[in-house]
Design a protein with these regions (language model features):
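Short loop/turn segments that connect beta-strands within beta-propeller blades
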Residues: 19-22, 65-69, 111-115
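Loop/turn residues immediately N-terminal
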Residues: 11-15, 58-61, 104-107
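N-terminal carbohydrate-binding/catalytic regions of secreted carbohydrate-active enzymes
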Residues: 15-59
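Conserved beta-propeller blade signature
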Residues: 4-8, 50-54, 97-100
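Repeated scaffold domains used in trafficking and secretory/extracellular systems
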Residues: 37-44, 77-93, 125
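An edge-strand/N-cap motif at the start of beta-rich repeat modules
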Residues: 1-21
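Residue-level detector of Asp-centered blade-edge/turn motifs that repeat once per structural unit
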Residues: 1, 45-49, 91-95
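A short beta-strand motif characteristic of beta-propeller blades
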Residues: 26-34, 70-80, 116-125
Length: 125
């Protein structure tokens, strides 16, 4: 199928692929706006606005400009802070909130407009 998807690289790039040729990078954007040592861990599109969001290792959310690769921080960061090396975000379109889970069991809900944690749920086992 003619389906576009995106992936992060370890060197702060966002690659675009097509499912017709998943091994071929169609385009690559160098991402700008991270602090020194900060990494992006996960991305997901917000269904309500079609914006691409990213989670950083510094417990912050960003939106990604798909034209120039610039990052815009959302809020000032969230608490409790990440206590993991592996994390994933996923939008719940029904309530327009971000689910954040980590390899250490953290399970948070984040607000896409403020970047704040709005709920801490039970640990994921």
């Amino acid at each position: 199928p003619d389906l576009v998807f995106f992936a992060l690289t370890d060197d702060a790039k966002l690659n675009r692929y097509n499912a017709k040729a998943p091994g071929t990078v169609e385009a690559s954007l160098t991402l700008s706006g991270l602090s020194i040592g900060e990494k992006l861990l996960s991305i997901d599109f917000r269904p309500a606005t079609y914006q691409l969001y990213a989670l950083s290792s510094n417990s912050r959310l960003y939106t990604i400009n798909l034209t120039d690769g610039s990052l815009r921080v959302v809020g000032t960061g969230f608490t409790p802070v990440l206590n993991a090396q592996v994390a994933n975000i996923d939008f719940n379109p029904t309530v327009d909130r971000i689910r954040l889970v980590t390899n250490t069991g953290q399970n948070l809900r984040l607000h896409p407009e403020t970047g704040a944690a709005v709920a801490t749920d039970g640990n994921i086992n």
